[in-house]
């Protein structure tokens, strides 16, 4: 059993490694996988690159050929193919194909980025649809 916080931490490392190895065997590229937290059951497409210190949580789907940059957090969101997210926080949002986000941006609940939209540095979007302008 687990009786101390140290033992809990060691067990979490073991589980994180097992989960991350499963994603890598299915074609996801994890840079420094020991720093990446992905909850079990999240769908991630082939050839998506996930950099260091990323957390992917909840009811999240990430498409193929994406880049999830270091220090990003994605929760309960839908990310289409060919999306680039750099050091940003995405929560309960939709990002369509070919869009790019950040660095240092935040998509809050009900943010929806249409295809090929660019959201730059330090931008926050909530409850809005952003399309070609």
Go through each PLM region and give its residues.
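Structural signal for interior beta-strand "rungs" in well-ordered beta-sheet cores
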Residues: 29-133
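Conserved alpha/beta core of the MobA/IspD/sugar-nucleotide pyrophosphorylase nucleotidyltransferase superfamily
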Residues: 1-45
């Amino acid at each position: 059993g687990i009786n101390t916080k140290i033992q809990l931490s060691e067990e979490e490392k073991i589980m994180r490694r097992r989960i991350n190895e499963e994603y890598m065997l299915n074609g996801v590229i994890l840079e420094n996988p020991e720093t990446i937290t992905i909850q079990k059951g999240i769908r991630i497409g082939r050839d998506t690159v996930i950099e260091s210190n990323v957390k992917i949580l909840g009811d999240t789907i990430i498409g193929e050929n994406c880049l999830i940059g270091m220090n990003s957090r994605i929760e309960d969101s839908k990310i289409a193919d060919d999306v680039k997210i750099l050091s940003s926080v995405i929560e309960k949002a939709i990002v369509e194909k070919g869009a790019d986000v950040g660095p240092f941006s935040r998509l809050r609940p009900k943010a929806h980025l249409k295809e090929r939209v660019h959201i730059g540095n330090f931008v926050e979007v909530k409850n809005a649809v952003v399309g070609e302008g």
